């Protein structure tokens, strides 16, 4: 990819995204981002060849995400940065969870476009204390803001950046630790069909626990990949 031009106009697509709304409060961001757009603005905004578009927008239909990314390509912007999720790592294991599946499909579309890059985020929180118990692939709001202000991409032709780290959080009780371990065994026993545990996920959610479902599987796979 050629070097950046002297001037780059930063544009955010997805101003309603919760993550972006939190990032927007970080020091320096308001001055750095010239425009923030919603879905409805995509077809009427005047993009320029000097634009770098940070895509926080997400649609549940894969074709809508593809249309959005191809519209940016057709607009002739300098660079598209698609914000994706660490949960896409589970795609080689199962496709039964909607969110990771759709994000993975959009990530593939983004990487098929020559001017696009992909930024992979973990569980996004303002502070580590907000993470679920256990080992988490996590990214702080402040870390995303710093990256947006001074992007550092991998050298060479690599266009995918993983911006996360593993963070260990304590369990609320020995009982929760036991439940976490047992849930993991059940999840792995389900093989490519972990969504069989969805009734149990609803129970865990009602109890205020947040480490179930694709969050558990994603954290497990990232933990393995970073220690192998």
Where do the PLM segments sit?
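Flexible, glycine-rich beta-alpha linker
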Residues: 89-91, 117-140, 171
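Active-site Tyr-X1-5-Lys
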Residues: 97-120
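SDR active-site strand-loop-helix element
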Residues: 13, 56, 80-86, 119-121
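NAD(P)H-binding glycine-rich loop region in Rossmannoid oxidoreductase-like domains
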Residues: 40-75, 86-94
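Alpha-helical substrate-binding/gating segment
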Residues: 137-178, 187
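Terminal hydrophobic/aromatic helix or amphipathic segment near a protein terminus
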Residues: 167-218, 222, 227
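The catalytic Tyr-centered alpha-helix of NAD(P)H-dependent dehydrogenases
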Residues: 94-102, 136-141
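N-terminal Rossmann NAD(P)H-binding glycine-rich loop of SDR-like oxidoreductase domains
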Residues: 4-31
């Amino acid at each position: 990819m050629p070097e950046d031009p002297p001037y780059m106009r930063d544009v955010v697509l997805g101003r309603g995204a919760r993550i972006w709304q939190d990032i927007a409060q970080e020091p320096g961001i308001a001055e750095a981002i010239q425009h923030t757009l919603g879905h409805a603005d995509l077809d009427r905004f005047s993009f320029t060849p000097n634009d770098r578009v940070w895509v926080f927008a997400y649609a549940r239909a894969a074709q809508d995400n593809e249309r959005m990314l191809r519209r940016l390509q057709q607009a002739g912007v300098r660079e598209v940065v698609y914000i994706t999720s660490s949960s896409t790592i589970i795609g080689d294991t199962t496709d039964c969870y909607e969110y990771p599946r759709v994000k993975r499909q959009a990530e593939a579309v983004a990487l098929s476009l020559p001017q696009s890059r992909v930024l992979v985020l973990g569980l996004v929180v303002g502070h580590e204390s907000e993470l679920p118990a256990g080992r988490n692939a996590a990214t702080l709001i402040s870390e995303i803001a710093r990256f947006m202000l001074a992007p550092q991409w991998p050298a060479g032709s690599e266009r995918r950046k993983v911006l996360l780290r593993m963070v260990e959080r304590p369990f609320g009780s020995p009982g929760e630790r036991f439940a976490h371990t047992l849930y993991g065994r059940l999840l792995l026993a389900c093989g490519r069909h972990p969504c069989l545990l969805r009734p149990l996920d609803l129970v865990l959610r009602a109890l205020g626990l947040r480490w179930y479902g694709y969050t558990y599987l994603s954290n497990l796979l990232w933990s393995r990949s970073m220690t192998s």
